[in-house]
Amino acid sequence: MTLTEETLQFIREHRKDNVRNLALQAHKYPTVDVPAAIIQIVGRQIAEEKIPAWAAREGILYPTHLSMEQCSSEVTANYKVKIVSDTGYGSRKTFTDLTGGFGIDCAFLSACFQQSAYVERQETLCTIAAHNFSLLNLKQVMVCHEDSIRYLQMMEPVDWIFIDPARRDGHGGKTIAISECEPDVSALENLLLEKASHVLVKLSPMLDLTL
């Protein structure tokens, strides 16, 4: 993702503005990629509440509104770090995040490990994550543009795996069964346990564990 200096300046000047009004005034800024700028402005506005440490960092790139809504908050990412840190047995050298997304969980959890892998099948999210990890000096994180199941099948065993299944079906509707999430961790259980000493799974409280 490459933004021109004019677009970056527009983002800086309008980062607290109402994006609906900006969209209506797009014709006033012929040298600015207004749609791309609005994605960045909305992303930063969400991050100010959700991920304040990143919002305060100049140069962070943000994904679309849906990805920002779905990503972990700084508070919940730190909670996962505490889970890993409080686990007093086993090695903590290698870590793989199979559902990378915006990269919040991977960025925070990678601090616990010597080597980390961020896996994501959406190329745009990989590009954003690679930029942000470099900006944050997270040199221990490798970005992998790959399907999570295919990567899991091919990867070498690691100490920890993190996976956050999407609770949406192919039509964007919400699911209530673990088996309907993407990926289906119930079907991958044996392979996950074969590939990692510890597996940390984030599940929505809205899921019905009896299904």
Place the predicted regions along the sequence by residue:
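SAM-dependent transferase fold signal centered on methyltransferase-like domains
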Residues: M1-L211
